Curated annotation (Swiss-Prot):
It holds the Pfam family UDPGT. It catalyses: 11-O-acetylcyathatriol + UDP-alpha-D-xylose = erinacine Q + UDP + H(+); 11-O-acetylcyathatriol + UDP-alpha-D-glucose = erinacine Q2 + UDP + H(+). InterPro entries: UDP_glucos_trans (IPR002213). The gene is eriJ. The keyword Transferase applies. This is UDP-glycosyltransferase eriJ. Pathway: Secondary metabolite biosynthesis. Keywords: Glycosyltransferase, Transferase.
Amino acid sequence: MSTQNYHIVAVPPNEWGHMRPMIAFLARLVAVSLNSVDITVTLIIAESAVAKARTELSIQLAGEGIQSAESRFEVVPTAVHMFWPADAYLPALKATYAEVIKKKEPDFALLESMIHPFFDVVRSSATKPIKVGAWLPVALPSWTSMAPICYIRDDPQAYVKQVETTMAEKGLGYMEAASDAYLSHVNGRVLRIPGFPEMTDYEGFPQEPPVLLPVAMVVDWVFGIRDADILVTSTAQALERQGLQVFSKWLKEQPKHSDILAVGPLTSQRTPEVARKEKEEADAGGFTAFLDAWAAKKGPKSVLYICFGSVLLPAEIEHLYAVMRVLLELQIPFIMVLSDAARAALPADLAAAVRDSGLVKLTPWAPQQYILAHAAVGWFLSHCGINGTLESLCLRVPMVCWPLFADQPVLSILVAQVYGCGYELGEVRKGFGLKYRASTGKTPGGTVEDVTREAREVFSKAFFNKAERAKVDANLEKMATELNAAWDAEGDARASALALLDFIRK
C-alpha cells in the first residue's frame, strides 16, 4: 500500500440532487482505494446541509463496509446559502477554503462545474501542483448535445459576446439578455444525436420558456467543463454509452484534452445495515404501513410513486391536478412527494377527494430508494432527473416520464423511446413544449382535456395491461442487469474510479 496520503477537497452545491451523488461517489472512491492508495477527503458543505450530509455519508460508508468516517472524511461547514451567483458564495467559500488548506493542501479538488469561478481560487491558492476535477451530476453527453447548450459548449466566448451585444442593442439587464440570447438558438431545427431518434430542438424545453434554469448558471457550468483537468459525471455507461464516446472525442479536441469518467449509478449499496436504516425512516413516516397494506389488498406492483425532485413542480399545475384526478378515477394508490405549501394549494374538491379516497399518501419527503425497492411499487412518475432515473432503473421499476427542464427531456426520451423502460406523458407541456416533436411525430395540444385523455391511456396501460408490462419488464431487466454490474470488480464505473485514482497519483 502506498505510504503517501492524497488529500481531496470536494465542494458540492447544497441542492440535494447534486450533493448526495457526490457523497456517494466519494465513499465508493475511498472504498476502492483502501488496498492501494491512502485517501482522505475534506467535504466543504453549506451550513444548512451539514447534518444531512453527515447522515448520508454515514449511510454510504456503511454500504461500503466502512464503519468510521473520522479517519478518512472531514465535513467542514461554510456560510454559503446558495452556490450561485459567484458573488453570493465566493467570499465565504474563499474564507473556508483558506482555513482548510492551512491544515493540509489538497492534491485534487472535485468541484461542481457550475462553481467555475472558484476553480481559479483553488489554483491560485496552491503552493504545490493541484488538479481540478469538474463534478457533473447530469446526463452530460446527451444534454450538451441539445440546442442551445451545444452551441455554448463549442464556443462559450461567442455566446458571452452575443449577450453583451443583446444588452447594448436591446437595453436589457444581464439576466434578461442571457435568456434572450440563449433562446435565440432554439428555432425548430432537427437534431441528429447518436443514440437518439431524430428530435427538434424544441424538445429540450417541455415546460419553457420562460426558462426555469438561470442561463448564466449554465454558462458557468460550461466554462467549468472546458476548464477542468478531468470530468467526473454521475451518468452511467449503460445509459449513455454512445453519447459518452462522442463527448469524449469532443473533449479530447479541446485545449485541456481532458478525460471524462462516468461513475454512475450511485444508488446506495443495499447492505443489511443500510436496509435497516431505510426501514426505520420508512416505518417512522408511515410509508411501510401504507405500502404493506396496498400490497396485501391489490398485490405487488400496484402502487405508483410520484416525485418531481426537490426544486420544482410542473409549470402548468392544472396538468398535475388532472393527472391526480385520473389516478383516483382508476383507483390507483399512490405516494406523492408534495411540499406543505403545494398541498395547501390543492383545489378544495381535489383535496377532499384525495383525503376521502384512502388511496393516497401525500408527504413533503420520502425515502425514495426504500419505496422504489418495495414490492408494492409498480411504477415511478418522475421528472427524470439523473438520480431518480438511475435509482428506478437499477431497482427495476418502470417510469412514467414527465420532464421539466435541463437534462430531464433527454433522459425521458432515453427511458421511454430508446430503451423502452417506461412511457412518456407527451401532453403535459407548455411553451416550446407545444411545438412539433420529431421524435414522436406529434404536436402536443397541452389542454387539460388532452392531459386527462392521455393520462387515462398511459396509466391504464401501465397498471392493467399485462402484455405491455411484460415488454417493459424485459427491457428493464436488461438495463438493470447492466447498470447493477457497473461497480462490480470488472465494472465500468469501478474502472472509472480506479482511473481517477491513477490520475490523482500521476
